[in-house]
Amino acid sequence: MYGGICICVLLAALSVSSLGQQPAGSHDGSPVAAELQQSLTEPHRHSRAPSSAGPLKPAPRLDGSFEQRATIGALLAKYLQQARKGSTGRFSVLGNRVQSIDPTHRINDRDYMGWMDFGRRSAEEYEYSS
């Protein structure tokens, strides 16, 4: 009980002292405080670490020049060609395995390693006498 009262008094003292401080808008003309406030209000851009696939090339900036647009167009065309070729890497193995399954197989959407339909299994294990 005594500990709860001490915590309430401490919180009240902290809230009163924080109300007595300067508002966030006034910085007394300090350039460091103004820079800090500006950095806090700007949206942050988080960058991801490069993947292990290889080094990344810096993307060209769009200044509206014809050469840069042509470069981006060529990169887009190359990407679309690769996308049309199909999947590569780990997904190609999965695609080959799914294609080798009998075409009359009824549960293609649930075929992955380790999947088991427990309802069907339990119904097959127990023979019901009627």
UniProtKB/Swiss-Prot annotation:
Keyword hit for Secreted: yes
An example Gene Ontology CC term for this record: axon
Main location: secreted
Subcellular location: Secreted
GO biological process: axonogenesis; digestion; neuron migration
Positions of the pro-segment in this chain: 21-48, 122-130
Free-text description of this protein's post-translational modifications in UniProt: The precursor is cleaved by proteases to produce a number of active cholecystokinins.
Regulation: induction: By dietary protein, amino acids and medium-chain triacylglycerol.
Residues recorded with modification Phenylalanine amide: 118
Key words of the record: Amidation, Cleavage on pair of basic residues, Hormone, Secreted, Signal, Sulfation
Tissue distribution: In the small intestine, the major production site is around the vitelline diverticulum.
Listed GO MF terms: hormone activity; neuropeptide hormone activity
Record keyword 4Fe-4S present: no
Modification Sulfotyrosine occurs at: 112, 126, 128
Signal sequence extent: 1-20
Purpose of the protein: This peptide hormone induces gall bladder contraction and the release of pancreatic enzymes in the gut. Its function in the brain is not clear. It also decreases food intake and regulates gastrointestinal physiological processes.
Family as reported in the entry's similarity comment: Belongs to the gastrin/cholecystokinin family.
Protein name per its UniProtKB record: Cholecystokinin
Native source species: Gallus gallus (Chicken)
